[in-house]
Every structure is written in structure tokens, then in C-alpha cells.
From Swiss-Prot:
The lineage of its organism: Bacteria, Bacillati, Actinomycetota, Actinomycetes, Kitasatosporales. Keywords: Ribonucleoprotein, Ribosomal protein, RNA-binding, rRNA-binding. It comes from Streptomyces antibioticus. CDD domains: Ribosomal_L10 (cd05797). Part of the ribosomal stalk of the 50S ribosomal subunit. The N-terminus interacts with L11 and the large rRNA to form the base of the stalk. The C-terminus forms an elongated spine to which L12 dimers bind in a sequential fashion forming a multimeric L10(L12)X complex. This is Large ribosomal subunit protein uL10. One of its GO terms (biological process) is translation. Belongs to the universal ribosomal protein uL10 family.
Length: 176
């Protein structure tokens, strides 16, 4: 690759690192072109999967302000640049790797923080952002319902107590 081509490739990779929420580095050795196409389709529109040159990717990551360990750049490397929900893309990669053991997740980056392969797998185990937000909203709604029940119970309990006191006074007044 000529020097101007390398500079253009580094600039493009740097831009991808900067515009992505996450990037997952994988080793794809042994995968067929058809399997790579299937992987790209399974990642959907929120991620772009690209086979990259290790040296250029390392330079681009550094220019984007991302520090990655050198061991991530051993062997043939491809990067999934994620612009959408990183959980969904991590799940897609994990599921594909289960069916195709030749795909090895090496590690990655999430919001500028380096992640190990195990952390990527833990990320894949999380529920999507929408599901987590709906659970949080449900928890808030349940707490509001509980608070409303307590506030409704207080006045009715007070009324019952006052009625009981009146009845008791009426009995005592009638007994005398």
C-alpha cells in the first residue's frame, strides 16, 4: 500500500473510532467469505464490520485517543464499529462466535474505555438499553403506586379511628 493510501486508511479508521460508540476487535482466521457476509448481516445497520491492517488500526486508535493493548493486534484482525446499541452488537458477535468457533473476540472499546474479551461477553449478557429503561420505569411506577396506597390509607385510617372514638364516647356517654 502506498504511503498516501495508508494515510487515507488511517484517517478513515480514526474517523470510525471517533464516530463509534464501541468497537470490537475480532480474529476471523478460518471464516469463509460467506460466513463474513452472514456476520455483517447479523450485526445489522448499527455496526460496520471491516477487515483491517493491524498497524494502521493501532495508529488510528492512538490518533482517536484510544489506548489498546498490543496483544489485540496479533493475527488477522477485523473490527466491528458500533454506532447503535453496543449490547445488541455484542450479542450478535457472541451468538455468531458460538456457531462459528473460528471467530474469536479479542477485546474492544466502549465509550473510549478498553474492554477485554470477557468484558465484551458480559456486555452481551446485558439486556438492551430499551429493556433496562422500561424496567426502571416499571420500578418507578410501582413505587409511585405504593406511595399512593400509603397516602390513601392514612386519611381512611384516620376517619376509622375518629369514628371508633365517637362510637366509644357515645357508648361511655350512654352508659353513664
Amino acid at each position: 500500500m502506498a504511503r498516501p493510501d495508508k494515510a487515507a486508511a488511517v484517517a478513515e479508521l480514526t474517523d470510525k473510532f471517533r464516530s463509534s460508540n464501541a468497537a470490537v476487535l475480532t480474529e476471523y482466521r478460518g471464516l469463509t467469505v460467506a460466513q463474513l457476509k452472514t456476520l455483517r448481516r447479523s450485526l445489522g445497520e448499527n455496526a460496520q464490520y471491516a477487515v483491517v491492517k493491524n498497524t494502521l488500526t493501532k495508529i488510528a486508535a492512538k490518533e482517536a485517543g484510544i489506548t489498546l493493548e498490543d496483544q489485540l493486534f496479533a493475527g488477522p484482525t477485523a473490527v466491528a464499529f458500533v454506532t447503535g446499541d453496543p449490547v445488541e452488537s455484542a450479542k450478535g458477535l457472541r451468538d455468531f462466535a458460538k456457531e462459528n468457533p473460528n471467530l474469536v473476540i479479542k477485546g474492544g472499546v466502549l465509550d473510549g474505555k478498553a474492554l477485554s474479551a470477557d468484558e465484551i461477553k458480559k456486555l452481551a449478557d446485558l439486556e438492551s438499553r430499551e429493556v433496562l429503561l422500561s424496567k426502571l420505569a416499571g420500578a418507578f411506577k410501582a413505587k409511585q403506586s405504593q406511595a399512593a396506597s400509603v397516602f390513601q390509607a392514612l386519611p381512611s385510617k384516620l376517619v376509622r379511628t375518629v369514628d371508633a372514638l365517637r362510637a366509644k364516647q357515645a357508648e361511655q356517654g350512654g352508659a353513664e
